[in-house]
Amino acid sequence: MTVKMYTLSTCGHCKSAKKFMGENGVEHHFTDVDLLSGDERKQVLDEVRKYNPGCSFPTILVGEKVIIGFNELAIREALGL
């Protein structure tokens, strides 16, 4: 299962989520939203708001499940770890 994460490059919780995925061998893709600009940034922020109206980070998509923030237990449950 591939995990999609919306993150900020300066966010400590986002860094923890990325580290967790790497340490557990979870295939994941992330987008550091703060490093985008212009229309691309607006488009990605609109996408984040679909899953997380508060637009907070990290926003993590595991299949159909949305996890807001770095919640290791919720991530483990969603991934079956």
Predicted regions and their residues:
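Thiol-/selenol-based redox modules, centered on thioredoxin-like
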Residues: A74-L81
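Thioredoxin-like thiol-disulfide oxidoreductase module
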Residues: V33-G54, L81
